Amino acid sequence: MIRKYLIYISLLFIVFEVYSKPAFISQDDSYELDFSSGEVDISVNTNSKFNLSFKDESWIYIKSIENEAFIKLIGESYDNGAVFTFQTFKKEGKIKLVFTYQNVKDSSEFNKIIILKITKNFEVAIPQGVGGGSSRDNNIETGNNLELGGGSISGATSKEIIVRALNLSYINDYKGAIDLLNKYNFNDDKYILLKAEIHYKNGDYLKSYENYLKLKSKYFQSIVFDLIRLAIELNIKEEVLENARYLVEKNVDFSESIYLEIFEFLVTRGEHEFALNFSSLYFPKYINSSFSDKYSYLLGKLYESESKHKDFLKALHYYKLVIDNYPFSYYYERAKIRYLFLKRFF
């Protein structure tokens, strides 16, 4: 009987180990990627080495200058599929790793985006402050006066609950992590931040946004991009405009992907004047853009719109750029449809 229980416990341990690795990669671990989804969240530690692997050797890694402060590609192998070895540095943050699959046999193409969260061991990742300062670890602090809500376990601290919730999130049990955090009422900024991050991963953007708002007055610079991202998801135009104006006024640098998210939102929500001014300020910084197809398509949409900027010839020009230069792009068919439609008027 005892032997049976020991076998059962051993099996549970093996199952836990199998499911814990995909969400959190430890030192020298490997994560296998596939075509199941276009975007995957992965957490790693600072100053660690890990592998990302594909069964097919047709994958390539798209290097980004913006990631150089966080991570370095130190090796790649195509002997048995494609294996990419990375080394993280001491800097914490959230970055995007882009891989693209290009099969020359059937001309198929697929992009895989890894949202890589780099944190110290068992610590909540604080979003990178827009000022680029080195005091990031002190941006969001733990409150000194901690109170336990109803149903709390006597003696538990906010740090202990954060660690337990993080462990659940590492195995993608976001609901379990949220349930655990909701059992307590710690007056703790890192605690609130973790709730915001896990609600986002669980797809509850409104609750995530509400928690970020609690931190806005004290830590706006650290969470401005999270507020923009959620405001776009929730279609809160005033929040996007307010924060985008802040970025312009302070001349803040940010990634091309964030720029395009804001630009697309402005175009599709009819803020054409702001979109053009925003574009004129920021797009020149991305002269070696890896998203020129999307940018050209959005400009075509802008110049096709019913506004004072309507110019069908310019719209045709930008749609034609996508058609001629990006036959495997996600925007190719869309641009082609709009181009053929507008071409009828000329």
From Swiss-Prot:
Q: What is the lineage of its organism?
A: Bacteria, Pseudomonadati, Spirochaetota, Spirochaetia, Spirochaetales
Domain of life assignment? Bacteria
What name is this protein filed under?
Uncharacterized protein BB_0043
